[in-house]
């Protein structure tokens, strides 16, 4: 199999320019972040932070200072509210399973939206086996939560609600505060979790203002290293660990703390927040250039998700009608443009993105969808190159589709 | 919901870039479609069949992934010049998969769909003619059944979507 991939890579030889836009699924880690991490592998703080020697105490100091910084960026009250986990998936698992198991005496009902990230959907599926039931609140055609249905769904048995701050696929900024008020009004005991991974570093976010009980953030979603994230747990909220092992500074995640990754996550956060307005404006400007350019150059295209200030500034999700998404990602890759598709042409039962289906997109629209996210490192030239390449790529795939595949 | 790596072969990539016999055939004797856009996986086949029941030309259009395009392209090449009987008997999804240098297992169905579409076209030819040869089985073959099953799934999915919309 790896031989096949070598041939695929060889087919990319001679690419003039590369533009990486698949920042939903993985990102570059900028040099500044890597440089900040490197000393922590072999020069300092490489010890176990719970042990009584200099490298251990250095690690302890580093981790506490990192928690402090991230707690500030999130608007948390104290650094102890920050719990590092190996990523967004793990933080969401900890939030949902931990909160549900620890508080099951308060009820066994969970409320989420139809468009929560895959890991949230999967955890609620698993929790069914433990007697928890989940209500999925529908969203409208732009991905906004139906607050009436939310109100109906919450009752005295509801132990937990989980609503992402920003949808990772279509960029919808949810009215989290209103949703939380509705939930708490019906049941003050219900814990409210939000996956804020796609909001952190992109929109103003303050967990104390939002009054959420739990919030997930992820390093790689802000150009930090993969393999690290954090779960904010408001002081006084009861959540137990979900994995067993040796506990150190992170009371809810056993195992030896990964200090270099924590440093990388913190550095990436600093870079995102240092010049927050400028970063965000840059992302928005390039994203708008990208979307406007596509609509100018191509017909039969649809933007998925809302327009304007209710959309996160980095997200572009466009359906190219009469164009199959996976084929388009390969065609673009051969031209040095890297994107992902909401098409799921990889299983017998080919279900496209659950988010696009939830907002009422036809299957053919979902199969032709491409997700892109701009970052502060993209340039005008990157987007110009993308716009040069996209029309011929789409037209070639549409040429293969011809008269077939129109529903 | 999970993702799988898709290490396509050089042959799949080559055929994706330069598919053979692509496009609608205006003078086709028979056309057949398999799959459904709801699945993101659909092929149209066009066959030009002469009086001796030899396939003179074959072409395709594909709403599908690289594997779908590559296998469809291979099938058009394979059936060209064959009698309907040997196209029916000798073109199997396994041969098609071998011809593209193998496929990731989750993409086997693309080859199956391509062969299913050709078999449908052949069946349709005899239906139009009003007589079937003795070698043509009444019962659907594996590939035809698979195509049908995929279409049924698509229908179920679409129904579910409509129900969701009405909610």
Predicted segments — roles?
Chain B
Residues 2-27, 31-32, 82-167:
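C-terminal binding/interaction regions
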Residues 3, 15-18, 44-47, 66-69:
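Short hydrophobic/aromatic-rich motifs at helix boundaries and adjacent loops
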Residues 38, 48-112:
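Active-site- and interface-proximal helix/loop "cap" or "latch" segments in soluble metabolic
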Residues 22-55:
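Structured beta-strand/loop patches that form or line metal/cofactor-binding pockets in enzymes
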Residues 2, 33, 61-65:
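Short, surface-exposed loop/turn motifs that are enriched in glycine and acidic residues
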